[in-house]
Amino acid sequence: MEPISHVVKSSLPNYLSSLPIPDSFGGWFKLSFKDWLALIPPTVVVAGLGYTTYLAFCPAARCAGKDSGRCNSSIRKNEAKVVTMVDVEDIAGQAAFCRCWKTKNWPYCDGSHGEHNKQTGDNVGPVVVKKK
């Protein structure tokens, strides 16, 4: 317990008092490169604590990344796995099949990937099957 007491009562106050924090707004522009380097560690600690607090107290932040890996957002959601069988003999000349899961005409592509590509910067397109 004594080492913790020493850090809290002596080391930390000495460190914080030695930081080059200017008295005025204009003083920030007069800091040297060495002074800016000395300010990096406490800034990183404060930013880390702020981010950790944000994650702890903002429910939307905790579940923001959970749904991002899902590509199918609407097609046959009641099934465990979406599988569609199409016989090659049933294809007249060629058929374009959706790969982006945005189509309203599943499993065929209706061009919905174009809007998806514009919004996300993606480059997804259909799978085109041709009859020989």
From Swiss-Prot:
Taxonomic lineage of the native organism: Eukaryota, Metazoa, Ecdysozoa, Arthropoda, Hexapoda
Record-given protein name: CDGSH iron-sulfur domain-containing protein 2 homolog
TM stretches of this protein: 36-58
GO biological process terms on file: intracellular iron ion homeostasis; mitochondrial transport; regulation of autophagy
Cytoplasmic side stretches: 59-132
Annotated membrane topology: Single-pass membrane protein
Residues holding [2Fe-2S] cluster: C98, C100, C109, H113
UniProt keyword Metal-binding present: yes
Molecular function per GO: 2 iron, 2 sulfur cluster binding; metal ion binding
Family: Belongs to the CISD protein family. CISD2 subfamily.
Cellular component aspect of the GO annotation: endoplasmic reticulum membrane; mitochondrial outer membrane
Organism (species): Drosophila persimilis
